[in-house]
Every structure is written in C-alpha cells, then in structure tokens.
C-alpha cells in the first residue's frame, strides 16, 4: 500500500508540474502532453496498487519515506533556474534557421530570429538602422558588457544553447544577471573583439516578468 501511495504522490507531482506551468521552465511545450500522460499513468498505477493491497499491512521502509519527502519538496519548492549561469556553461549554437525568420519585418523578429539572421548574413551593415523590439534575460560575460539573450532547446534544459545580442547599454543602465528586459531601439554597427558586429542601440529598456515559456525552440 505504501508503494501505491508513493506512486500516487510522484504521479501528482509530475501532473502538477504540467498544470501549474512549472514544466515550462524545464522542457519544450511540445513534450508536455507526454509528461502529463506519464503522471496520469503513475497515479492510475498507484491507485491500483492501493486497491489491490488495501488489506495488507506492511512496514513502511525508510527509502519510501525519503522518496515521499523528496516528492513533497518538489511540490512545495518551485524551480528557479539561473539562465545566465546555464548560458555561461553551454556552447553557443542554433538549429538551422526557419525561412520565415528572414521574411519577417525587423520589428517583429524575436531575439533568436535576429541571431539566426545575423549568422546567415554576417555583414552588420545589412541591418544597420533596422528597428528592434526584443526581450530576453541579461547574460553576464567574463569580459565586457552583458548581452541580452535567450535559451533555445530541442528537448529540455539539458540540451539548451544560448543566443545573445550585443547591447550598447546606456551609462545609467545597470542590468543584473538573469533580469528579464524588453528592449526597443535599432541595430547599429559596433565593434566586439576587434571585429565589426551588429549592436542593439536601445531607445527604451523596460524590466519585465520572466515569460511563462522562457525557452524557445
């Protein structure tokens, strides 16, 4: 019976992660239904075990108590990943760009779409003066000013790759690592590591809450 209750607890933990939106911080949305089905299956299996062994009396083993405590902690303590730290420990790289990203008007491109465009057309002069309307988290760099960045995933945080844009931060701006910002402005041409690069010149910077789904495909 104890094993059945443990399965119910862990099944509810998985299902609650989907329903509460916590899973959006860890996994691409396309996989959420599969995870939700797994949680429902665990609950069903647990209830079945409880029903079949409802009259049996067994000593509750300490590993079961540890698992139950861990499941309870996961339910009580929401995940709070540091995207800036994760980005600093991951290689940069993006999947092949979608054609749509290149035909969108500049002000409609997301940060990731801008990065893909600039990698396919590395001459920053081609985008000089283009309007920019992006959002992302502040990614601290070992040297130089922080970037504005997003994480892209194929499946989950384990395969996340960062993509960032250089920003000409105003003198009175003090962006904090992991802070989410919405930036409006235009693309200009600057220099980074001795090479010409596209630089976002902000006309407006606004702190925003972390998006419901911060990971991009």
Q: Where would I find each of the regions flagged by the language model?
A:
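Membrane-embedded alpha-helical segments of integral membrane proteins
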Residues: 3-55, 59-60
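N-terminal amphipathic alpha-helix initiation
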Residues: 1-4, 169
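Membrane-interface segments at or immediately adjacent to transmembrane helices
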Residues: 78-138
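Internal/C-terminal transmembrane anchor helices
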Residues: 57-83
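Bulky hydrophobic/aromatic packing residues
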Residues: 31-32, 112-115, 172-174, 187
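Domain-scale activation on soluble regions of proteins
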Residues: 21, 27-31, 41, 55-61, ...
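OB-fold single-stranded nucleic acid-binding module
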Residues: 22-26, 84-85, 91, 123, ...
């Amino acid at each position: 019976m104890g094993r059945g209750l443990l399965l119910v607890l862990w099944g509810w933990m998985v299902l609650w992660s989907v329903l509460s939106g916590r899973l959006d911080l860890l996994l691409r949305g396309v996989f959420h239904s599969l995870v939700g089905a797994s949680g429902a299956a665990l609950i069903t299996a647990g209830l079945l075990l409880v029903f079949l062994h409802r009259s049996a009396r067994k000593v509750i083993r300490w590993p079961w108590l540890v698992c139950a405590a861990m499941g309870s902690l996961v339910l009580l303590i929401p995940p709070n990943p540091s995207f800036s730290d994760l980005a600093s420990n991951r290689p940069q790289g993006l999947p092949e760009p979608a054609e749509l990203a290149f035909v969108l008007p500049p002000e409609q491109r997301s940060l990731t779409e801008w990065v893909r465009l600039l990698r396919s057309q590395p001459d920053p002069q081609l985008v000089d003066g283009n309007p920019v309307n992006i959002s992302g988290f502040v990614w601290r760099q070992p040297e130089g000013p922080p970037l504005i960045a997003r994480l892209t995933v194929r499946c989950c945080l384990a395969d996340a790759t960062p993509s960032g844009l250089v920003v000409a931060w105003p003198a009175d701006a003090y962006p904090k690592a992991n802070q989410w910002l919405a930036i409006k402005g235009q693309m200009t041409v600057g220099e980074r590591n001795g090479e010409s690069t596209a630089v976002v010149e902000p006309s407006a910077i606004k702190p925003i809450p972390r998006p419901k789904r911060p990971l991009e495909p």
